Amino acid sequence: MSMFADIPVGVGEVYSGERIRWQDTYVEFGGLRVQYKFELVKVRKMDEVVDGKITIIGPDIKDLEPQKSYSLGIFIEVAGSQVEEELEGVIERRIHEYTNYIEGMMHLNQRYDIWIRLSKKSFEKGLNSFHIIGKIYQRLFKSELPIIEKIQITFITDPEKVKEMYDYALKEYEKRDARARGLKDEEVDAFYGCTLCQSFAPTHVCVITPQRYSNCGAISWFDARASARIDPKGPVFRIEKGECIDPVKGEYTGVNDVVKMKSGGEIQRVWLYTAFGYPHTSCGCFEGIAFYIPEVDGFGIVHRGFAELTPIGVPFSKLADSTAGGRQVDGFHGISIEYMRSPKFLQADGGWERVVWVPSAVLERVKDFIPKHLVDKIATEKDAKTVEELKNFLVAKGHPIVKRWEEKAKAEAAAKPVEEKALPAVAAPEAAAEMAVPVSVGVVGGFRIILKNAKIRAERVKIVREKGK
């Protein structure tokens, strides 16, 4: 008999990756429409946990008005003789996996940024109470992580209680992150990988190092090491570093080998500390995005909770579409907030000296880790809402990026006379170098123009297709 025989909907890995659109949603918890939401796991002593207890503080699912968004706190307390405090982040991240095992439920993100949807179909089938979801969690946790001997779960929907616990949760996350700081990538012989999000991004492999947290911000190197130890066949695994090919970009032979295998050959190389070339892939649960702004040759950072437009006129959701899915896209880099505190943060791209715009809420959280001479030179949404305003701010504040513009302009000016030097009128052989220029015509098709030993100056070029060709 299945351990989910009494559950009104299906439960299993087959439902992972299910996307629930708003029109098919019965209720939504968290997400952009709600300010306060969280999921938190705490390790307790054996006598502090009542095994199997499920508590709901506030209205249950069946008592909520449909087609609305609500605050939600998921607070799980676990105990066991082998359960250690360093496992909290690992257990917590499994909430994402187990929620997606439930037919008609979609879970994205983590920690203080959760986004959950319940479909109309599953509600109609009888999935109308957190008691049911709690039972599923408890059975999955105990089945897949048998070191958990006792587990009690509290669901909070009362907005005031969620807000109260939200502040407590933030302090717990910070304490957990602080424990992981200090260790350097060069000091360990192995990194860790995570494929927990492959149900949404099949080619994504998260590489977790001491100085590069998981994109979701929920798993440190210590968390990953503990997870791989207690669940060696689980989604978190050890990666032998191998040879360091490039210490600045962060390329390792061992990482390349594992990522190639785990991505089914789609991703061949990874540079851990840059947003260009072969950047680390992104799933969909990243806390923030580093995005390149070509007009200023610098990076903007935007987090999931930012509801306004970025200076390039695009919101987080649109940038996320360009970043997620397990792809390597130059200039779009999914990151965690904790990675922004790392000395390896965009190391190959110039680090914080290349960052020009960050939402004030995030800047406040990481300002103690930004070089002091840069803190007031980085614009926020209060300083610049357009690229032009951003340029003016950077010049007025003397951001280092301005010097970069000046040096680039000087280099271009120095190269210009050489480029414009007239060529002697000497006949060139047919074997001389040639340049091919693809020219698009309409939606599909095109011509290929080959220029041989030619220097062309034109204010305007017009190409017209001849009739019948």
Walk through the language-model features, giving the residues of each.
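Glycine- and charge-rich intrinsically disordered segments
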Residues: I132, I136, A411-A432
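N-terminal charge/polar-biased segments
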Residues: E407, A411, A415-E419, V444, ...
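Cysteine-centered metal-binding/redox modules
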Residues: M1-A413
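Compositionally biased, non-globular sequence tracts
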Residues: L423-K469
